[in-house]
Amino acid sequence: MTDPAPIETTNLGRAEDTAIAWSRPRDVLTAPSPPDHPGGYFPSYLGTVRPDGRPHATGIGVRWHDGDLYFLSGPSTRKSRNLAANPACTIAMRLPDGPDVVLGGDAAPIDDPAILEAVGALVRQSGWPVEVTAGGFTAPFGPRGGDPPPWRLYRFVFHAAIGQGGEGATRWRFAR
């Protein structure tokens, strides 16, 4: 798959503002190691819905691969249980030099060995020595407060995004 291009771009700011180009957040997300973030990660937050309808948010590390975002989660975490019941979710992130971006879409676990290997290589570049296992990853250590290994890899396919920064606000829609 190639990187998605918006099918619709809408300026949400003042009339005199111009729409923010999708290339601004895309270029940061697709960079091998984001500027000023040598580990490759920058603040990102996953928003899901609990079975009772209440919202849930948690910090995650994301990686861009082949047009989608990927993140890891243990099978018994609240986010994994929420996504099993309802894959609709958001990822919000503060990108270096803006704009701040919120993406809306769906997340599902991935078992494809080729994708696991490709994303595993990206994660290892950040210094986390993950190894691919059947359907996920393991490592000698994990995130603080997280489930022990193995961790599932989730693919987040976004359908819409909103970017907001000092120069205005823009909504992008994608046909995916």
Feature-to-residue mapping (PLM):
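A generic structural signal for short, non-catalytic loop/turn and secondary-structure boundary residues
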Residues: 39, 84, 96, 146-149
